């Protein structure tokens, strides 16, 4: 179940779909259409669900009943506010593998800040090292693609752990 938007999170789900997973992309009616239907969603089935409604949450839980993985890339605290955070999902599905991707991680002084590739490049100092006289953004999203691939790797390892122990992560 893929709740992700933009690039890093959806890249994880797309890679899983390319390797044969049945990925259900849950799109939000609150997200601009341009962010819902791009290259990173190929190979996925898609459904439009408003997680901010009771009916939407009921549909989410119905889908999660038979899922192996839930992916999200919300800003810190947003998944919990929507009722789809790790502990909330784990309470219903203790064996679930829950992948969470964001720009700054879940710990540290930047946790909870919104961000995506260009912001991450600026904070990391990458924009001043690209050879231009003025800070510039790299012409490709190496960090987002790399993050998505590493998230996929982490999900695969968590699935292997679950297969061996029965425990979700």
Predicted segments with their positions:
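Alpha-helix N-cap/helix-initiation motif
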Residues: 5, 52, 140-144
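Short glycine-rich, flexible loops that bind phosphorylated cofactors or substrates
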Residues: 9, 78-80, 106
